[in-house]
Amino acid sequence: MSEGKSPAKKRARRSLSISKTKKNECNSIISFFNNVPPAKLACPICSKMVPRYDLNWHLDEKCANNDNITPVDLRHVGFTDSSGSTVNLTNTVLENVTPGKLSPSKASLTPDPSDSAKMGIKQQTSPYFKNNKDLVFKNQDKLRHHNVKVITLGSLSSKLSRRYTEARRSICKKNEEFASKSPQSPSSTVVRSPVDNCSEIEDKDQILENSSQKENVFTCDSLNEQRTEHSVEDTKVLEAESQEATQECGRSPLTPAFSDNAFVLFSPDLTRGNPLRSTSEDSLEWETITGIDGKDVEKCEAGSCEEVKVTVASEAKTQLSDWEAKCHSSTPDDSKGCNIQDLLLEGDSDLKNEITCRIPLEQGSSCDVPDKTVTVPPSHPYYLRSFLVVLKAVFENEEDRMLFDEHEKEIVTKFYQLSASAQKLYVRLFQRKFSWLKMNKLEYEEIAPDLTPVIGELQQAGFLQTESELQELSEVLELLSAPELKTLAKTFHLVNPNGQKQQLVDTFLKLAKQPSVCTWGKNQPGIGAVILKRAKGLAGQALRVCKGPRAVFSRVLLLFSLTDSLEDEEAACGGQGQLSTVLLVNLGRMEFPRYTINRKTQIFQDRDDLIRYAAAAHMLSDISTAMANGNWKEANELSQCAKSDWNKLKSHPSLRYHENLPLFLRCFTVGWIYTRILSRTVEILQRLHMYEEAVKELESLLSQRVYCPDSRGRWWDRLALNLHQHLKRLEPAIKCITEGLADPEVRTGHRLSLYQRALRLRESPSCQKYRHLFHQLPEVTVGDVKHVTITGRLCPQRGMGKSVFVMEAGGPTAPATVLCSVEEVALAYYRRSGFDQGIHGEGSTFSTLYGLLLWDIIFMDGIPDVFRNAYQASPLDLCTDSFFASRGPAIEARLQRIHSAPAESLRAWVAAAWQAQEGRVASIVSWDRFASLQQAQDLVSCLGGPVLSGVCRRLAADFRHCRGGLPDLVVWNSQSRHFKLVEVKGPNDRLSHKQMLWLDELQKLGADVEVCHVVAVGAKSKSLT
């Protein structure tokens, strides 16, 4: 090296200068623009050309819902010749074939993708998936004495080199010559292997480097993830026995049965070395297992599948001999083409066992052949299957079926009589917001390329209405887009035609109300009619689901999900949440606890009762939406309308029946819903600073005890605040506090809040003349706990919100600065204090332990009406007093055992419940709260029986009011088993009344509790240095 000599093995450097002596001139810049990535890529499932960036969406929404593609095993699929016979590949093994060395990146049997432009603009199918050419094996003898060696793709620099480009072009040229020389059969079927697709994709390196759809492209390296070289030696070709088909599979006009023109496609999962999974929405898992006798058996795992026996009969000898003849007649160069195709069946035995093909197969068709079964998934997409499950569940129950009249039952019957495409489209439209939709904006290719006949069928059946029935100007204006509204505004010469959409809509509505200037001609249309006509002309064809059938299906969904939270009953969502739950359960991704459904009490007396409840539930949903959006005036108008409707219903006879229902069923009555609306009205009036009206509403709510008794504490507390703070009425405020403390429904935090307000009023100088009113107050005492103070660096931030702290992390060698919450600052402090374990879970930590220790009691049988459907995460009476009352002896016995149990027993009980119920959806259990079962067992060992039994008793007695306020942190030392329960308070934060009560209760149970105050260091306005 000192003499300036290069090393012997050093590769000669390539000059970077452009020299005239070079053999190959640099390509023109035009070639760069000619080789840009294509705008569309071929879908690996259905072979359609789709936009590059829509490939994921296409696979999820269209290919996955293609009913005509059914996964079956390759060894059950026969290649078909022109005579209609098929080759049975089930027991065919290609042996004694050792393909020669060949890199999959430098061989392809398909034309260059750039040639697709020459085939015409109208082409919508990738040339790689054309099924009009057959694969020809030529030179079988050559194949028997060669090894296949899969070479890795190499570095990026080698792929970009000119030498690599030249070699690739020469290989493509040879492949084109091979394709032109090979005889083709017009009736043959092309079978594409993943290796072929790898070659095609490699010819578009630029696509791989620039596209965002890399996960949908086959990769050659994944074929040989564990090994880089595969070879098969000393094998023999066995001839398969042929047999005649005993029965021909039935055909369907929509889903053709297995035939000679059925194309075969491979899933991308093959190239990743994974077992093939169906891309349909059925989530079926297909496995191939070999029995004792060597025969392959197909196993389908799914919630519900139909098995169809399909005969795969063929003349294997004739077809196989044809292949051998073609391979023997091929040239040596052409043998490479056979090698690529043979890699699929011969290169790797493990890969061969995972191959699954797709053929169109009609559901329900069958051909009787022994030991040959193919499981066909349900033909409907997931949303239609879930919708049908809901309909079946409701109308199979006599109590629910009686809530619909004959006309409504006929509507459901008509829906069942619709075609599959019409049912799919209706469910899609039903799940969308209830409004008019432009027909040219609807695009559901998985349903039908042209939706016009499907829409016509739905319109004729009475499920859809078209623009001919669109007569409301406000609805037409909402249908128009912003550019269309501006065009319409210019037509009518509005003052500000380029304004916002809502401003233009309001202007048009005001203009339509103006009287016409022309006084002659009474038959002349007014300005509103003219605007309506012009607007409908701009909107074009439109449609909307009819209100009548939609209301019927909405009530069906309401009955099906009656036990769900009423906040989820969004009128505009079309039951999306309920259908999603059904889907997840059917797919096995969601599982509810095991319990016995026991429905004894009828909630709704008749159809009108259900309709009133549904109307009130939708009104509550509309008011909640307006409040969430900050539209307080609109929310006030809606609440006043609801109040008027409720006043008309107060004398209805059905309300007396509702009053006698158990409390946990009374919440599904119309009176309960309107009471919740009036409670929301109080908040709306307070937001609008209408405190006088708010006080009247609160007094009206407190005057009844039938509905929402669990909210009485909040109502009393709010009434006292309005009278004391906002209206300055001291004597009524004191009387309110006295009555509130005497109310047995006022509990925990609200009771303490009222008592503390009374103490403040008693000490106030302005209340000296009312001190005699405080003599009858019941005393509420709460003990204090230990307080500690730590400091933390506050992150500079603007506006409101939780405080964010800056904390140093990492070791001395790799220091780092992280942003964290106030609870994480406290956890770091206690970690330095010797507590090696800690959880920030607030109430979910203790409710999870409560659910694990009392799981069998919470979901026990024998209690009527607490479990009314199969999708409940908790019993209906969990948050009522009847929960403890109906399970009193069992709960008392369990609490006694927990109180006196040693640590080993507690660990065993938690482990038994965890292992038996893990993953099931239960509202009180958060399975991700603990990192593992071991951590949960360690915590119960540290807490001990007395603390656990005391917490469980309080939660079981009044879960509604006691589930909140538990300490933020639980920290413990895994060696000494010392634990501490900590409530963390950041800057400008203080303890709530519920937190005070829980800290006092836990301290009485013997737990080490304390309040950790985190004081900020630094000002929010200052920046970090």
From Swiss-Prot:
Cofactor(s) this protein cannot do without: Mn(2+); Mg(2+)
Residue ranges of coiled coil: 682-704
GO biological process, one term: DNA repair
Zinc finger (UBZ4-type): 40-68
Region (Disordered): 98-120
Domain of life: Eukaryota
Subcellular location: Nucleus
Subunit composition and interactions: Interacts with FANCD2 (when monoubiquitinated). Interacts with FANCI, MLH1, MLH3 and PMS2.
Protein name: Fanconi-associated nuclease 1
Species, as recorded: Ailuropoda melanoleuca (Giant panda)
